Amino acid sequence: MGELTAFLLPLIIVLMVKHSNSRTHSLRYFRLGVSDPIHGVPEFISVGYVDSHPITTYDSVTQQKEPRAPWMAENLAPDHWERYTQLLRGWQQMFKVELKRLQRHYNHSGSHTYQRMIGCELLEDGSTTGFLQYAYDGQDFLIFNKDTLSWLAVDNVAHTIKRAWEANQHELQYQKNWLEEECIAWLKRFLEYGKDTLQRTEPPLVRVNRKETFPGVTTLFCKAHGFYPPEIYMTWMKNGEEIVQEMDYGDILPSGDGTYQTWASVELDPQSSNLYSCHVEHCGVHVVLQVPQESEAIPLVMKAVSGSIVFVIVLAGVGVLVWRRRPREQNGAVYLPTPD
């Protein structure tokens, strides 16, 4: 792992999405400014994603916006990349100035970070969402409400910026229009460009095994791999009832071949005659694995159902993605802290 990737690992942005029966597509752009960066880390980075796929990159070393997906390079002319390169060079300078201003306000020195996330989502029913927010040192700083054309500020420093930004009603309306119209238009265009990759479906391969995790404690693991898209719902049932509170979940991780893998586990009560089954839902297919009490042979039943759960973690780095399931009742966005 290179120095850049190692440094960016704490800069994960967690995106928690509600339990959903439909597939969601998203377009997200992340910008990261670093003051006094360590060796090998650019002072400014910008990356774009469609769903979990990196599509564009820019950093202060190359100072060029470049495609990260072949279907982006094939469908967008050279003048597109040059035009947005010039815009991002402007953003690079703006981030440098704003980060220095924030450090003065907070009386901070040394290495600090300033982040921006903007994007939109397109749901299967045609409805859309949009989001724009900033973070300082990995903590929420300013969050845009496009419905009220206002900013949510988290502290006194943010309130000072909020007042200045809200004085420019033209800019607020521009951001709202970009989130609701232009962002969605770009997302639809990119989905068409990369439809062979972005809109394909590969079903999960699922298996269950037992493992003695502690002396006298047996844990059942349900593992799914080889699936795409990464939206998947896994649960354990005991005697036909879901046991969410007793389960543990693994990360949803890229397998390196364009598919994903994950797992869910539950501790087995050796003194009971409970019947356990693992249920996996992915793109309308429901996989049920019944765990025999004595035998290691596990029958597999598949049937068509509707329903899936969407959960995402996006790393604001250069092409490195990690995914993790979050509690299904939560929704919103959380920035994990970055090192000082």
From Swiss-Prot:
Alpha-3: annotated segments: 202-293
Residues annotated to bind 5-(2-oxoethylideneamino)-6-(D-ribitylamino)uracil: 31, 46, 65, 116, 174-175
Secretion signal span: 1-22
Spans annotated as Antigen-binding cleft: 23-201
Location of this chain's protein in the cell: Cell membrane; Endoplasmic reticulum membrane; Golgi apparatus membrane; Early endosome membrane
Region of interest (Connecting peptide), residue spans: 294-302
Membrane-spanning ranges: 303-323
Residues that hold 8-(9H-purin-6-yl)-2-oxa-8-azabicyclo[3.3.1]nona-3,6-diene-4,6-dicarbaldehyde according to the record: 29, 31, 65, 80, 116
Post-translational modification: N-glycosylated.
Ranges where the Ig-like C1-type domain occurs: 203-282
Region named Alpha-2: 110-201
GO cellular component: endoplasmic reticulum; external side of plasma membrane; extracellular space; MHC class I protein complex
Annotated residues for binding of 5-(2-oxopropylideneamino)-6-(D-ribitylamino)uracil: 31, 46, 65, 116, 174-175
Keywords from the named record: Cell membrane, Disulfide bond, Endoplasmic reticulum, Endosome, Glycoprotein, Golgi apparatus, Immunity, Immunoglobulin domain, Innate immunity, Membrane, MHC I, Signal, Transmembrane, Transmembrane helix
SUPFAM superfamilies recorded: Immunoglobulin (SSF48726), MHC antigen-recognition domain (SSF54452)
Glycan attachment residues as annotated in the record: 107
Annotated domain remarks: The alpha-1 domain is a structural part of antigen-binding cleft. The alpha-2 domain is a structural part of antigen-binding cleft.
Family that this chain belongs to: Belongs to the MHC class I family.
Subunit structure: Heterotrimer that consists of MR1, B2M and metabolite antigen. Major classes of metabolite ligands presented by MR1 include riboflavin-related antigens, pyrimidines and ribityl lumazines, nucleobase adducts and folate derivatives. Forms reversible covalent Schiff base complexes with microbial pyrimidine-based metabolite, which serves as a molecular switch triggering complete folding, stable association with B2M and translocation of the ternary complex from endoplasmic reticulum to the plasma membrane. Alternatively, forms non-Schiff base complexes with ribityl lumazines.
Protein's UniProt name: Major histocompatibility complex class I-related protein 1
Chain's gene name: MR1
